[in-house]
């Protein structure tokens, strides 16, 4: 076992920075310094890929009531989300102006074809505005800022220089640009204008944790820290925290 945030950072060749993960089940903003996670400065958002897939289905049914009678497999909805959805850089403006909706038709199988309009950019928006789902949590950019803010002043700039995106839900077109824009706005709004976060958004970031894990496992320095089955049976799960924290 290892910190997914650390492995995401390692996939870029870094051992210090801020990992911003958005996967299927949850989002995290985790500061990493010298290979160690700062759990007290880690923030979690319970809105991620699976939540967005359910939200997209609700949006589709609301716009096309006839779909309620259709069997819409979860896999088909997830595929539709990945193919068609994107993050708006001006959500309120796009929502008000139908000319900016970019409607498109997509097949969801079983001979069923749906037309998406504003749903294309409304689907990922709860990661930035959880209130759209009735949740009181802050959006991911605010959590990323809080993670940096909670770190010692002497480390903030170094961590902000490497803000690594990881996870399949960061692959929406416009995601990196929106996060960058809002994270900078958070810094200015709270009096940290000198803090200039630099996002690292690699093309393979959907598999960043796996890639980082394969890289770390090949390091001789890491192999010396492997936990054997006998060690685990003797010490139990406490040993994981002693080794990896």
Curated annotation (Swiss-Prot):
GO CC, sorted alphabetically, is: actin cytoskeleton
What InterPro entries does this protein's entry cite?
A: Actin (IPR004000), ATPase_NBD (IPR043129)
PANTHER family listed in its UniProt record = ACTIN
Sequence similarity: Belongs to the actin family.
The name under which this protein is listed is Actin-like protein 10
């Amino acid at each position: 076992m290892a910190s997914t945030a650390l492995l995401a950072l390692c996939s870029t060749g870094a051992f210090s920075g801020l990992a911003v993960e958005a996967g299927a089940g949850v989002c995290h903003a985790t500061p990493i310094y010298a290979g160690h996670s700062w759990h007290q400065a880690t923030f979690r958002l319970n809105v991620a890929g699976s939540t967005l897939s359910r939200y997209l289905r609700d949006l589709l049914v609301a716009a096309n009531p006839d779909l309620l009678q259709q069997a819409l497999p979860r896999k088909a909805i997830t595929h539709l989300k990945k193919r068609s959805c994107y993050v708006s850089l001006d959500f309120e403006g796009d929502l008000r102006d139908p000319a900016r909706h970019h409607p498109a038709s997509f097949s969801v199988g079983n001979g069923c074809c749906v037309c998406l309009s504003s749903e294309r950019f409304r689907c990922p928006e709860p990661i930035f505005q959880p209130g759209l789902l009735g949740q009181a949590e802050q959006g991911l950019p605010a959590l990323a800022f809080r993670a940096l803010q909670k770190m010692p002043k002497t480390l903030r700039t170094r961590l902000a220089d490497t803000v690594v995106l990881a996870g399949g839900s960061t692959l929406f077109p416009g995601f990196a640009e929106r996060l960058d824009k809002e994270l900078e706005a958070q810094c200015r709004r709270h009096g940290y204008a000198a803090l200039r976060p630099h996002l690292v958004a690699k093309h393979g970031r959907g598999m960043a944790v796996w890639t980082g894990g394969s890289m770390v496992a090949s390091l001789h320095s890491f192999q010396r820290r492997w936990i054997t089955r006998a060690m685990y049976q003797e010490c139990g799960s406490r040993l994981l925290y002693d080794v990896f924290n």
